[in-house]
Amino acid sequence: MDSTQKQNILVVEDNENTRRLLETILRSAGYEVTPAPDAEEGLRILQGDAPVDLVLLDLFLPGADGIQFLRSRAEMEADRQPPVIVVSATEDMDTLRPQLRELGAKMALRKPFDVQELLDGVKQHATKRTGKAGAAAAASAVKAAPAAKPARAKTKGKSTTKS
């Protein structure tokens, strides 16, 4: 992905104040934001042409909830399944984490959340362009890129992935 192209974060959150707060945090950190007030709209956006690099998802939504969103997302084509970070006020987050991981969530934060922890998670997981436009851009970048030896990443100690 072109390093000058901003990553697009889909924020699926029904509470307008929380959605605006997340938008402000993400935009000030240099991300593009696509808001969705419910799971149905979020799923429509994932099925559209605009690339989505990550989803921030509330669990308690009108109509289909966050769990249903994750299940529907899992049934989509692989290029329509961006990473998901759950951000929810549920008291049962510790109990739900295994189910959320099983459904594809990379991370789960409880509201109120630590802004730096959220941004660290977004930076870590928002790495993949999805959608028709993203797939086309990735394909053209691969064709245009000269062949090179694959680089090996060095990691420190244990994984920092939070679930």
Describe the residue ranges of each PLM region.
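C-terminal output helix
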Residues: 113-122
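Short amphipathic alpha-helix used as the core "switch/output" element in two-component signaling
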Residues: 67-80
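Charged docking surfaces used in two-component/phosphorelay signaling
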Residues: 20-28
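Alpha4 helix (beta4-alpha4-beta5 surface) of REC/receiver domains from two-component response regulators
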Residues: 68, 91-107, 120
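Hydrophobic/aromatic residues positioned on beta-strands within the core alpha/beta folds
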Residues: 87-88
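Active-site residues of response regulator receiver
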Residues: 58
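Acidic catalytic/metal-coordinating carboxylates
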Residues: 38, 65-68
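Acidic, metal-coordinating helix/loop segments flanking the phosphotransfer/catalytic sites
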Residues: 35-54
